Structures are given as structure tokens and as C-alpha cells.
């Protein structure tokens, strides 16, 4: 084997070999249980980020683990067309390169342009997924707009429409005036900002007066421009100031519209003035109030967010109405919305109706892609009736057909599903699945799989002109069909029969409603088992937290704290990293701050760590459902782990290749250490499998690390040296056999998490075991064997380890050279301790570097010594001639003084109010941690001073 572990040399060639050999495909053995995971489809033109790397590592670990258990495994791969994101990328591209807009191209030509862009950049993310070691079946790769999936989408739309579960209606949506499309709640980013609350007088009609004799109500609003669309004023029905006015009217300033005063809980007596203006067409809460009181809806804005020339007036059901005039005062027409705000305030003030302006903290919704303030907008959209679909989806989780890991996410799911709103599925974009609906000139709507079917079903001759709906479906609509459409539905395919319901879905909790819930609803509606019972899309939902930076901040381009997973695999120089973080920025003014932060964090760029180290780190950090703060030190630690495993394997091979390892018969004697490591290994298998079976990848990674590093490398390899240097033939055979057996099993155990290094080493080790198979990927996963757990060997070895560690600690504390042989005395020995010493003298002397071991008679106190107590005995190392008492005390005093200096420095820092107020919580916690560490170190040094002073 190569002397040094170099992941760059082994990873890519290995992956190509696995893929070429077809090892990622299902084994097709239908006598075995199936295990299937659907990959959450990443954006086709995107690139891999830490969230992908994290989730895909978890999925690949599960898939490899189940594949090694002989299951018929499928990891279904595919990408998402990502409507709005992809369209925006291409729009920006043609604007930058050609100075054109999509309208210059026209719909067909622009869509062709997007397909070109997909062909050009669509392979990036799949190439990156290969670099991660993902064992997905590439031959089954799907795309949400491929022909098969597009047919499934049409089929679902048509069936839901025919069942009256899809309808077209006028409703309020989040409208992005820059992108000119409806967007989902997930694409809205709420930002805190300082604003104003305007208090405006609305004169009472018909001579009415308030309880305190005023002839007006004062309405408080943060959006005075929407006053032009008010159709009511709400007061709380319990409010003594106004309850007698319910049913009376006010005259709306500027427009002179007569609008009713309604009693509604939405008006809070404690907030503002207790009177709230109601604008059902421009506010989500007002829309609901308007529905409750059958108020008309008046839309005053264009799709660009400007004031209309004349308003659109609708009744509460969304039908056009003439209950109010559609006139808008000329001075406000065509004004941009924020200019209109100023103009309305000035006009109200001129009439003497502006009572006061108060500063007010606001939460303002912005579109996360367009970057402008979102406007609630009354538009015609297509909707799915969600309550009917939600009922079985709630029951599936209630009765345990679907389980959430961790369980607490069930509550989040229930709270949303039990109060579900109809789902707006239309988007005013060009890229996506076009809605399969056609209109004739009279405005009648026809829904079908294609125009030909529509004409045939509705007896429409060629003379009837039809135009297809311009809108496309929300990307989440096609994603909701992902578990079954990818397997060939609506055809009843073998794949659907074998792999559906799927086993586990791995997802971030942020899309529990947008994706998880909708998959459950859609799947249960369309997929039934042979008895007609609705099928669930998956049995388990494993929820991951978000990966944040080392300070707990969300990773984002604007913060400049994004780490590309492949930069940790391959390494990246500082100039390249700076270019990546500051090039093509939406907000170039942040570049300087980002540059400084990056230079401080990565002065030499990022070292290459290899894929296995990255995967191990991700698995180790995967504590269920909590957000994860990324830690480069952990990554370095797991890179060191891979080195340690490599070097340990080289040690095993150097001592076993070309030797008799007992695999072809011959007498074998197992030493205590051999019996101990076999027992340890089997206990490790048991605990590790339990962790993987319960989705505790962090615990599994910890178990693997602890056994490999501490038990196998640090102890067992050391404990084999006495046999290797002077054992009998039978003992040598026994130890070599154990070395090879445990290493080979350990490689299989670790393979799901770190596939590349384990396959590479296993190719050498398999020869010694007489295994002829081509790959570790298809080897059986280790099984726990209780007969291998020798309790006596475990107890005896743990005692020996305690004794060796005690001697090593005395050396370290007393500053005695590691190579200097020592005399060991044992006082107050139990029978067990004496037996252990007598049976394992050779081990003890070699590993603790002892000249002699003496068990003192019961009444012998022994000479002046440093002592340690272990189970059933007291260990003594006589100090005569070992140290110079004065020198040692002086050295310790110097150490104590140095540590006291550090302690007072940190205490002063933490006592500084300015520092504590400004510094992030994580920095303060780090300082406190350092302080604790120094205090512990000081206590240990003082203890040592006392021991030496007493000599």
C-alpha cells in the first residue's frame, strides 16, 4: 500500500469503476425486502452546497448499509426544473450578454434558450454528486420536465380538475411586482425595519358620534396608500368606545366612499386607536375580515405595483361588481406605490385629517429573488382544494403509517395540516409545466391532457379558436408527485410495484409543508394498494437541521460565509476562494468585509481533506433535527482519522502479507488481547447497527471513531507487539488471524460512511482472507456474534489498560522520559489483581516500559513513591533518583504563574461590559470555556506540587 493516504489518487477512479460495473443498481432479488430512497431533486442548473452534501451523505450511508444487508435497494436520482430560479438565471444571462429581455425573444424562443442552458450547465450538480460518492442508479435519472414526468403532471391536473379538487378563483397571493408573478410563502423573506404609523381621521356619516362626542374615527395604518381601496373599518365588538357604532358608516377621505363599520375580533382594543381600516384586496388579514362581513374588494394596483387609472371592484366572491365607483382621484393615478404613499399622506394632511405620525417597528415582506417589497394582490389563479386531500394525510401520521424522526416535527406537521389553506398552483412564468387548460373566445375553460383531447371531448370544431392558459404550475406541484412519477406512474410499472411506498425521505424541516405534506397528500390520493387503501409515499421522514457557519450564522452569498463542500474535498487557494466569495455579487459593497473575514478564517486557503473526511464529519455532526454549526477542526480531525486507519492497515498488512494467517487451517492460540479485541469489535457492531437503525448517524460515527482510534489502533496494535516479537507459531497465527479478521470486518462496518478508503484497503485485505469478490459494496454487513464476547477477556484487559495508563500518567506528571524503564510496586493487591499481573507480566512490562514488577507483602508500606489507585490495587513508582525535587518544584511554579496570567487576562475581558455587550454569544462562550480549562490545569499543577513537596 502507498505510504501516505492520498484521497485525490483513489476516489474518482474508484467511483468510475463502481458506476461502470453497475453496483449502484437494485439487485433485482424480489425474494429480498426492497429499500428505496428518493433524492430530493436539486435545481438542475444549480451546484452542490453544504445542505445537499449533508443530506446526500446521510442517504448514501443508509443505502450502502441496506445494500450490504442484501436488500433490493434503489436510490432514485433526479433534478428539478426549479421554475423561477432557472428562468431568472437565464433572464439575467441574456440581459448581460445580449442586452435583451425574455419578451424580445418571445415565449417559444426563450424556452428554447432555457433548454440550451440546461444542456450546458445541467451536468454540474450531477458531476458534483458523483464526487460525493453517491451510489445512485444513474441509469434511472429523471428530470421534472422530462416527457414521462410531464405526462404524470398533466394526468394529475386533469383528474383533480374533474373531481372538482382544482378550481380557478380570484384570491389574494404574494405578488412580486418586479418578477410579475405570484410567489409562495417560502420565497418571501420577512425583514425588520423602522417605519411609521399614520393616524388618519375618517369622518362619521349621517351625523353619528363616538361615545366621547367626536364626529370621526381615528384609524391607524402603516400603509396609507391602500386607503384608496378601503371597503370598511373594523372595531372590536367588546370595545365600549365604539361598539354602538357597529352597523353605521364612515365617509372615506379623498374618495368620499361610504363604507360600513363592522365588529370584528381582528381589531385589537389595546393596539393603535382600536379602529382598523379594511382593504380586502391588499392585505391578507383584511381579506379574511372582508369575507366574514361580505365586504366588496377593490384592487387599486397594477401588476407593476403602480396605482391604476381606475380601480377594479369585485363582490366578496370575486365577481365584478358596480356596488362602488371605480374612480380613483386623478392626482394618484399611475403613481408608483411608494410615491403614492407620500401623495396620499400629503392630501389627507391638506384636508386637516392627519392626526399624528408615530415611529413604528415593522416586518416587511420581500421577495427573496426579486429583492423588492411583496404586494398582496388579488389575481385569478388556479387552486387545489387542500382540506379534502389533507384529511387522509393527517390520519397517516396519526396512526403511525408515516413516522417523523425526530418525533417533535409531527406537531409542526399537524398544526399546519389541520388549518390548511387552498394551495395556489399557478405561476406567471414561462419556464415550467404549462397549465393544461384552454379558453374559447367567450371565456369558457376546457381542461384536458392536450388540445386534441379537449376538442374531441367537448365537440369543438376546428372553427372554434382556443388559446392555452399562459401560466405554468408551481414547481412544488410536480415535486409533490416525485415518489411515484419517477417510478413510471401513471403506468402500473414493476418499479412502482417493487419500490413504492419508499422507505425513508430525508428533508430539511424548512420544506415540511411545501414538499413533505404535499407529497403525502398527492400520493395518498393517486396511489392505492391492491385492496384500494391509499399508499403513503414513504414510511419514515428523517428531518435534518440547517448547516450554519462556525458562529451559527446561516450560510449565504451576501454574508460571504458559504463553504463549497468540494473545496474541502479538493482544497482551494486563498485567491481562488476570495474570487469565489466576492465575484458576481448582487451587493458588491459587501465585498471588502467578506474579503477580510475570509483572509482571517482561511489565511492559506483550504487544505484538501478528501471526500471520506467530509462525509465522516457530516455524519458525526448529524444530531437529529437540530441546526449544525460547521466546524473545520472536526473536519481536520476526521482527515486525521482516515490517516490513522490507513497507517493501521499498513501495519496489519506489513505483519500479515506473505505470512500464515491461519485461514487455511493450522493450530491457532488466541492471546488475551486477541480475545479482547474480538469481544470489543462485536459489541461495537451491535451498538453501531442500533445507531444506524435508529437514524443516529452522529452516534454511529462516534462509535466507529472510538473503536478504530482508541481500541484497535492505540491499544490492540500495541498489544500485538509482544506476540509479534516472540510468540509461538500458534500464537503468531492466532494474532495474525485476529488482526486480519477484525480489520476486514471493520472496513465493512465503516464502508457506508467512508466508502473510498474502505474499498481501497479492503482490496488488499480480501486476498489474505481468501475472498474473491470484486467489491466491498456488495459484501455482507457485519453481524453481532454473542459467542465472540469473552467477558473475562474484557475485564482483564480493561484492568491492564488501567494499570498502563496509570504508569504513563505518573511519567507525564513527574516529567520522566517515556523511554526510561521504571520499577513498579503494587500494594494492597486483590487476588484478581495479582492473577492479572502474573498472567500478563510480558504485556505490562513492554507497554508500560517497566524494569520490574513487584507485589508487596500485605504489611510492607514500600519506599517514598508517587502512587495511583486502580481497581483492586495501589500502584507505586519509587521516586529515588528519578527527579531533582528543587528543579521540579521551580518548573511547576513557573507553569502556575503562566496560567494565572492567562486566567486574569480572560477574567478582565469578561468583566469588561463593552466586550460582553458587543461580542457574539459564541465568542463569549469560547472565552468561558478557555477559563474553565485553565482553572482545571492550575488545580492539577498545585496537586503535583503537593506530591513532590512531600517526597
From Swiss-Prot:
It is found in: Cytoplasm. It catalyses: tRNA(Val) + L-valine + ATP = L-valyl-tRNA(Val) + AMP + diphosphate. One of its GO terms (cellular component) is cytosol. This is Valine--tRNA ligase. Residues 880-944 form a coiled coil. Its EC number is 6.1.1.9. Monomer. GO terms for molecular function: aminoacyl-tRNA deacylase activity; ATP binding; valine-tRNA ligase activity. Catalyzes the attachment of valine to tRNA(Val). As ValRS can inadvertently accommodate and process structurally similar amino acids such as threonine, to avoid such errors, it has a 'posttransfer' editing activity that hydrolyzes mischarged Thr-tRNA(Val) in a tRNA-dependent manner. It holds the Pfam family Val_tRNA-synt_C. Keywords: Aminoacyl-tRNA synthetase, ATP-binding, Coiled coil, Cytoplasm, Ligase, Nucleotide-binding, Protein biosynthesis. The keyword Acyltransferase does not apply. GO terms for biological process: valyl-tRNA aminoacylation. Belongs to the class-I aminoacyl-tRNA synthetase family. ValS type 1 subfamily. ValRS has two distinct active sites: one for aminoacylation and one for editing. The misactivated threonine is translocated from the active site to the editing site. A motif ('KMSKS' region) lies at residues 554-558. A motif ('HIGH' region) lies at residues 42-52. It comes from Shigella flexneri. It comes from the Bacteria. It is an enzyme of class 6 (ligase). InterPro entries: aa-tRNA-synth_I_CS, aa-tRNA-synth_Ia, Anticodon_Ia_Val, M/V/L/I-tRNA-synth_anticd-bd, Rossmann-like_a/b/a_fold, tRNA-bd_arm, tRNAsynth_Ia_anticodon-bd, Val-tRNA_synth_C_sf. ATP binds at residue 557.
Amino acid at each position: 500500500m502507498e505510504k501516505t493516504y492520498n484521497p485525490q489518487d483513489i476516489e474518482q477512479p474508484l467511483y468510475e469503476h463502481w458506476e461502470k460495473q453497475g453496483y449502484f443498481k437494485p439487485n433485482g432479488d424480489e425474494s429480498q425486502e426492497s429499500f428505496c430512497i428518493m433524492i430530493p431533486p436539486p435545481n438542475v442548473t444549480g451546484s452542490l452546497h453544504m445542505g445537499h452534501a449533508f443530506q446526500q451523505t446521510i442517504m448514501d450511508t443508509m443505502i450502502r448499509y441496506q445494500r450490504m444487508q442484501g436488500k433490493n435497494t434503489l436510490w432514485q436520482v433526479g433534478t428539478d426544473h426549479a421554475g423561477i430560479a432557472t428562468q431568472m438565471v437565464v433572464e439575467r444571462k441574456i440581459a448581460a450578454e445580449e442586452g435583451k429581455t425574455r419578451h424580445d425573444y418571445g415565449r417559444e424562443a426563450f424556452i428554447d434558450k432555457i433548454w440550451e442552458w440546461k444542456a450546458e450547465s445541467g451536468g454540474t450538480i450531477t458531476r458534483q454528486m458523483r464526487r460525493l460518492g453517491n451510489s445512485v442508479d444513474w441509469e434511472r435519472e429523471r428530470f421534472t420536465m422530462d416527457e414521462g414526468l410531464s405526462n404524470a403532471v398533466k394526468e394529475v391536473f386533469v383528474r383533480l380538475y374533474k373531481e372538482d379538487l382544482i378550481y380557478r378563483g380570484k384570491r389574494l397571493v404574494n405578488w412580486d411586482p418586479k418578477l410579475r408573478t405570484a410567489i409562495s410563502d417560502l420565497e418571501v423573506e420577512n425583514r425588520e425595519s423602522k417605519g411609521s404609523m399614520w393616524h388618519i381621521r375618517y369622518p362619521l356619516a349621517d351625523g353619528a358620534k363616538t361615545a366621547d362626542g367626536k364626529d370621526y374615527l381615528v384609524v391607524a395604518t402603516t400603509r396609507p396608500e391602500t386607503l384608496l381601496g378601503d371597503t370598511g373599518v373594523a372595531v372590536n365588538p367588546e370595545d365600549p368606545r365604539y361598539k354602538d357604532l357597529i352597523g353605521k358608516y364612515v365617509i372615506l377621505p379623498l374618495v368620499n366612499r361610504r363604507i360600513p363599520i363592522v365588529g370584528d375580533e381582528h381589531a385589537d382594543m389595546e393596539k393603535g386607536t382600536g379602529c382598523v381600516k379594511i382593504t380586502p384586496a391588499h392585505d391578507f388579514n383584511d381579506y379574511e375580515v372582508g369575507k366574514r362581513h361580505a365586504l366588496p374588494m377593490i384592487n387599486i394596483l397594477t401588476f407593476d405595483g403602480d396605482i391604476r387609472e381606475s380601480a377594479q371592484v369585485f363582490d366578496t366572491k370575486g365577481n365584478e361588481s358596480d356596488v362602488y365607483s371605480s374612480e380613483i382621484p386623478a392626482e394618484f393615478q399611475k403613481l408608483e406605490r411608494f410615491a403614492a404613499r407620500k401623495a396620499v399622506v400629503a392630501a389627507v394632511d391638506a384636508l386637516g385629517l392627519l392626526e399624528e405620525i408615530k415611529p413604528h417597528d415593522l416586518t416587511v415582506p420581500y421577495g427573496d429573488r426579486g429583492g423588492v417589497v411583496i404586494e398582496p394582490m388579488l389575481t385569478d389563479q388556479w387552486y387545489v382544494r387542500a382540506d379534502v386531500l389533507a384529511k387522509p394525510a393527517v390520519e397517516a401520521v396519526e396512526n403511525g403509517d408515516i413516522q417523523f424522526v425526530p418525533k417533535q416535527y409531527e406537531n409542526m406537521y399537524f398544526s399546519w395540516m389541520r388549518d390548511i389553506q387552498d394551495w395556489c398552483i399557478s405561476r406567471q412564468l414561462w419556464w415550467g409545466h404549462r397549465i393544461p387548460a384552454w379558453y374559447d373566445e367567450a371565456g369558457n375553460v376546457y381542461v384536458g391532457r392536450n388540445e386534441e383531447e379537449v376538442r374531441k371531448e367537448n365537440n369543438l370544431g376546428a372553427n372554434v379558436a382556443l388559446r392555452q392558459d399562459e401560466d405554468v404550475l408551481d414547481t412544488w406541484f410536480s415535486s409533490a408527485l416525485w415518489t411515484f412519477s419517477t417510478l413510471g406512474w401513471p403506468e402500473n410499472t414493476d418499479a412502482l410495484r417493487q419500490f413504492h411506498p419508499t422507505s425513508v425521505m430525508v428533508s430539511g424541516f424548512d420544506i415540511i409543508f411545501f414538499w413533505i405534506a404535499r407529497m403525502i397528500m398527492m400520493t395518498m390520493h393517486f396511489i392505492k394498494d391492491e385492496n384500494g387503501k391509499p399508499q403513503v409515499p414513504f414510511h419514515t421522514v428523517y428531518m435534518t437541521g440547517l448547516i450554519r457557519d462556525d458562529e451559527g450564522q446561516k450560510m449565504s452569498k451576501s454574508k460571504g460565509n458559504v463553504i463549497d463542500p468540494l473545496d474541502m474535498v479538493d482544497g482551494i487557494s486563498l485567491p481562488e476562494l476570495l474570487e469565489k466569495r466576492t465575484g458576481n455579487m448582487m451587493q458588491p459593497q459587501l465585498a471588502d468585509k467578506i474579503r477580510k473575514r475570509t483572509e482571517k478564517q482561511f489565511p492559506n486557503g483550504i487544505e484538501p481533506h478528501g471526500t471520506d473526511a467530509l462525509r465522516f464529519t457530516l455524519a458525526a455532526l448529524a444530531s437529529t433535527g437540530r441546526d449544525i454549526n460547521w466546524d473545520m477542526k472536526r473536519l481536520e480531525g476526521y482527515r486525521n482519522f482516515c490517516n490513522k486507519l490507513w497507517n493501521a492497515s499498513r501495519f496489519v498488512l506489513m505483519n500479515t502479507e506473505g505470512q500464515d494467517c491461519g485461514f487455511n487451517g493450522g493450530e491457532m492460540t488466541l492471546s488475551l488481547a486477541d480475545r479482547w479485541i474480538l469481544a470489543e469489535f462485536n459489541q461495537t457492531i451491535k451498538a453501531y447497527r442500533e445507531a444506524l437503525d435508529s437514524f443516529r448517524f452522529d452516534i454511529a460515527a462516534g462509535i466507529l471513531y472510538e473503536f478504530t482510534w482508541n481500541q484497535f489502533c492505540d491499544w490492540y496494535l500495541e498489544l500485538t507487539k509482544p506476540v509479534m516479537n516472540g510468540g509461538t507459531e500458534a500464537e503468531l497465527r492466532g494474532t495474525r488471524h485476529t488482526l486480519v479478521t477484525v480489520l476486514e470486518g471493520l472496513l465493512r462496518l465503516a464502508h457506508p460512511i467512508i466508502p473510498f478508503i474502505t474499498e481501497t484497503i479492503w482490496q488488499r485485505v480480501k486476498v489474505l482472507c481468501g475472498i474473491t469478490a470484486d467489491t466491498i459494496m456488495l459484501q455482507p454487513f457485519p453481524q453481532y456474534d454473542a459467542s465472540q464476547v469473552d467477558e473475562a477477556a474484557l475485564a482483564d484487559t480493561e484492568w491492564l489498560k488501567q494499570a498502563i495508563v496509570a504508569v504513563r500518567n505518573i511519567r507525564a506528571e513527574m516529567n520522566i522520559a517515556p523511554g526510561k524503564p521504571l520499577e513498579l510496586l503494587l500494594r494492597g493487591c486483590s487476588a484478581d489483581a495479582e492473577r492479572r499481573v502474573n498472567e500478563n507480566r510480558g504485556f505490562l512490562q513492554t507497554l508500560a516500559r517497566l524494569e520490574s514488577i513487584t507485589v508487596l507483602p500485605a504489611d510492607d508500606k514500600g519506599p517514598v513513591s508517587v502512587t495511583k489507585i486502580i481497581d483492586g490495587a495501589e500502584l507505586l513508582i519509587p521516586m529515588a533518583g528519578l527527579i531533582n525535587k528543587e528543579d521540579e518544584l521551580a518548573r511547576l511554579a513557573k507553569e502556575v504563574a503562566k496560567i494565572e496570567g492567562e486566567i486574569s487576562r480572560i477574567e478582565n475581558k469578561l468583566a469588561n461590559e463593552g466586550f460582553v455587550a458587543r461580542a457574539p454569544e459564541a465568542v463569549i462562550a469560547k472565552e468561558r470555556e478557555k477559563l474553565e480549562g485553565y482553572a482545571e490545569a492550575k488545580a492539577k499543577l498545585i496537586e503535583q506540587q503537593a506530591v513532590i513537596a512531600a517526597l
